[in-house]
């Protein structure tokens, strides 16, 4: 029986060693990124279907939810502190102030944030279909450029 226990302990140590190697090599991080990309790809696909059906207000909320998560991940990848209470504007300003991306990108993200805020707070006349379509395409490009 002790031999079996020693064998299990050895197998456990081998598994832990393997996990440590994967962590050190960044492989588990890459798997997490793949899962996140798949989930948010689904969200962006849903937004695209909403846009095609004329439901651009909820599409704006979905697209910017993906964008906000992407900004959090970008902050994390660049060792910038992020609080749970940080909103899209705070994340955007932090990234731009640290020169992670340009002021032009910051202004674009500010515009997308304003569109989302109008959608989220019932200012529907301020939400234009063409702005949400452009935001959807812009966020796709942003994700490919910054997190791809």
Q: Which residues fall in each region the model found?
A:
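A structural signal for well-ordered alpha-helices, especially hydrophobic packing surfaces
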Residues: 13-23, 51, 70, 116, ...
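Residue-level detector of well-ordered alpha-helical segments, enriched
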Residues: 8-11, 15, 58-63, 108
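Short, charged amphipathic alpha-helical segments flanked by flexible coils
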Residues: 75-104
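Charge-enriched, short contiguous segments at helix-coil
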Residues: 1-10, 103-148
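Charged, terminal alpha-helix-loop-beta segments
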Residues: 42-46, 61, 86
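Short, hydrophobic, well-ordered secondary-structure elements
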Residues: 47-48, 52-75
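Internal, Lys/Arg-enriched amphipathic helical interaction segments that engage polyanionic partners
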Residues: 1-42
